[in-house]
């Protein structure tokens, strides 16, 4: 087995009440001015003020950038960077789901390294550590609060840039399920399927290790048991907490084993049409699993067993097929759209989408490597 590296934030706070603990632990850190990166909903709902008040109690001032939209853009990064500089912020707090986390990562990275966001597209392109970042999570899915992945939309090229860089790994991650109770069903479903995709892609990645395998399988098990409950009753705290742990486990898996064609393709859909990332993943997942099954059927069956399917006595091919069907059934049961047509994607755009997907960093570790025609066919199979 080749050598491997395991990336994770220095400190990871989990469970009810972990938000207050994490911010109290900043006492004595020397930080004076925080930039809180969030979105308008988090600000209007009072969660940004809650965090700002907790910071103030520790003697830390804060400025707020709440202009992050789903699929954060280069423009958003520049806007946040200006506020950071104007307020002499010495560290960054991201508050929300994947979009605020990714935007904050890019702000923190460019703040210390200079240049433009696009300079860091690819793997480990930065020279210096980013500004310290605390990522406070309010969704259970992206795991961006604890990864070295940062996805920013280039509005000019209409593509999502994948920045995979150890220097954007947050210093502290916070997963307090009390902050996740307010997630609507649609967001719970989309982010939960994103987490399941992380588990599947990490487990079948060419860079998988025994550590990432263990994380991926446990994540799949917990998601299968708790996602629908969390969707049906958002106030079910055991389900919310289980999903918080599950998405974190899936994050540990893909942060170190990387991903595959589902994400490489979903990034293009999100960047080109401004579609929700988790929904794109959910629609594409069964199609890419079917494509990969010719080389990793046994691994797909393993995930199915972890999800609680009675398939241990089946052959690898049959077990993989049953697992893929279970994924389809779960997605349908929580209201995920059936195909790309329902998302508004267009078949005539597929050649361009496929070309960009093959250049995405996430494509490198897919277990089955395809050419332009095969990836086009994969996209078309999802219509």
Swiss-Prot record:
<feature type="binding site">
    <location>
        <position position="71"/>
    </location>
    <ligand>
        <name>NAD(+)</name>
    </ligand>
</feature>
<comment type="similarity">
    <text>Belongs to the iron-containing alcohol dehydrogenase family.</text>
</comment>
<feature type="binding site">
    <location>
        <position position="194"/>
    </location>
    <ligand>
        <name>Fe(2+)</name>
    </ligand>
</feature>
<feature type="binding site">
    <location>
        <position position="39"/>
    </location>
    <ligand>
        <name>NAD(+)</name>
    </ligand>
</feature>
<feature type="binding site">
    <location>
        <position position="147"/>
    </location>
    <ligand>
        <name>NAD(+)</name>
    </ligand>
</feature>
<protein>
    <recommendedName>
        <fullName>Alcohol dehydrogenase 2</fullName>
        <ecNumber>1.1.1.1</ecNumber>
    </recommendedName>
</protein>
<feature type="binding site">
    <location>
        <position position="98"/>
    </location>
    <ligand>
        <name>NAD(+)</name>
    </ligand>
</feature>
<feature type="binding site">
    <location>
        <position position="182"/>
    </location>
    <ligand>
        <name>NAD(+)</name>
    </ligand>
</feature>
<comment type="subunit">
    <text>Homodimer.</text>
</comment>
<dbReference type="Pfam" id="PF00465">
    <property type="entry name" value="Fe-ADH"/>
</dbReference>
<feature type="binding site">
    <location>
        <position position="263"/>
    </location>
    <ligand>
        <name>Fe(2+)</name>
    </ligand>
</feature>
<feature type="binding site">
    <location>
        <position position="138"/>
    </location>
    <ligand>
        <name>NAD(+)</name>
    </ligand>
</feature>
<dbReference type="InterPro" id="IPR018211">
    <property type="entry name" value="ADH_Fe_CS"/>
</dbReference>
<dbReference type="InterPro" id="IPR039697">
    <property type="entry name" value="Alcohol_dehydrogenase_Fe"/>
</dbReference>
<feature type="binding site">
    <location>
        <position position="139"/>
    </location>
    <ligand>
        <name>NAD(+)</name>
    </ligand>
</feature>
<dbReference type="GO" id="GO:0120542">
    <property type="term" value="F:ethanol dehydrogenase (NAD+) activity"/>
</dbReference>
<dbReference type="InterPro" id="IPR056798">
    <property type="entry name" value="ADH_Fe_C"/>
</dbReference>
<feature type="binding site">
    <location>
        <position position="160"/>
    </location>
    <ligand>
        <name>NAD(+)</name>
    </ligand>
</feature>
<feature type="binding site">
    <location>
        <position position="277"/>
    </location>
    <ligand>
        <name>Fe(2+)</name>
    </ligand>
</feature>
<feature type="binding site">
    <location>
        <position position="198"/>
    </location>
    <ligand>
        <name>Fe(2+)</name>
    </ligand>
</feature>
<comment type="function">
    <text>Iron-dependent alcohol dehydrogenase involved in the formation of ethanol from pyruvate.</text>
</comment>
<keyword id="KW-0560">Oxidoreductase</keyword>
<feature type="binding site">
    <location>
        <position position="277"/>
    </location>
    <ligand>
        <name>NAD(+)</name>
    </ligand>
</feature>
<feature type="binding site">
    <location>
        <position position="183"/>
    </location>
    <ligand>
        <name>NAD(+)</name>
    </ligand>
</feature>
<dbReference type="Pfam" id="PF25137">
    <property type="entry name" value="ADH_Fe_C"/>
</dbReference>
<dbReference type="InterPro" id="IPR001670">
    <property type="entry name" value="ADH_Fe/GldA"/>
</dbReference>
<keyword id="KW-0408">Iron</keyword>
<keyword id="KW-0520">NAD</keyword>
<feature type="binding site">
    <location>
        <position position="267"/>
    </location>
    <ligand>
        <name>NAD(+)</name>
    </ligand>
</feature>
<feature type="binding site">
    <location>
        <position position="179"/>
    </location>
    <ligand>
        <name>NAD(+)</name>
    </ligand>
</feature>
<feature type="binding site">
    <location>
        <position position="99"/>
    </location>
    <ligand>
        <name>NAD(+)</name>
    </ligand>
</feature>
<dbReference type="GO" id="GO:0046872">
    <property type="term" value="F:metal ion binding"/>
</dbReference>
<feature type="binding site">
    <location>
        <position position="149"/>
    </location>
    <ligand>
        <name>NAD(+)</name>
    </ligand>
</feature>
């Amino acid at each position: 087995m080749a050598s491997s590296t395991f990336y994770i934030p220095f400190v990871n706070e989990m469970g009810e009440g972990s938000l207050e603990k994490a911010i109290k632990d900043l006492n004595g850190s020397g930080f004076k001015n925080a930039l809180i990166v969030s979105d308008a909903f988090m600000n209007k709902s009072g969660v940004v003020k809650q965090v700002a008040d907790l910071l103030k109690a520790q003697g830390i001032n804060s400025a707020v950038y709440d202009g992050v939209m789903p699929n954060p853009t280069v423009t958003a990064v520049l806007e946040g960077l200006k506020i950071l500089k104007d307020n002499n912020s010495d560290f960054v707090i991201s508050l929300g789901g994947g979009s605020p986390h990714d935007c904050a990562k890019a702000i923190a990275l460019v703040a210390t390294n200079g240049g433009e966001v696009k300079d860091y597209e690819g793997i480990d392109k930065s020279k210096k550590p980013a500004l310290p970042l605390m990522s406070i999570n309010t969704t259970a899915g992206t795991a961006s609060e604890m990864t070295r992945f940062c996805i920013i939309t280039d509005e000019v090229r209409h593509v999502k840039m994948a920045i995979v860089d150890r220097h954007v790994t947050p210093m502290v991650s916070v997963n307090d399920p009390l902050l996740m109770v307010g997630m609507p069903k649609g967001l719970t479903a989309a982010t939960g399927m994103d987490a399941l995709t992380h588990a599947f892609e990490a487990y079948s990645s060419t860079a998988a290790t025994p550590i990432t395998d263990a994380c991926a399988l446990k994540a799949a098990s917990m998601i299968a048991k708790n996602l629908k409950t969390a969707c049906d009753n958002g106030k079910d705290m055991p389900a919310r907490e289980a999903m918080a742990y599950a998405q974190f486990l899936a994050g540990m898996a893909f942060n170190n084993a990387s991903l595959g064609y589902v994400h490489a393709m979903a990034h293009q859909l999100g960047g080109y049409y401004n579609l929700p990332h988790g929904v794109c993943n959910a629609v594409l997942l069964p199609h890419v699993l079917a494509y990969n099954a010719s080389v990793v059927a046994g691994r797909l069956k393993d995930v199915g067993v972890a999800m609680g399917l009675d398939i241990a006595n089946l052959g690898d091919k049959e077990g993989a097929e049953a697992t893929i069907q279970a994924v389809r059934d779960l997605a349908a049961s929580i209201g995920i759209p059936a195909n790309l047509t329902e998302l508004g994607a267009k078949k005539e755009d597929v050649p361009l989408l496929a070309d960009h997907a093959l250049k995405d960093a996430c494509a490198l570790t897919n277990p089955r490597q395809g050419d332009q025609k095969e990836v086009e066919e994969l996209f078309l199979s999802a219509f």
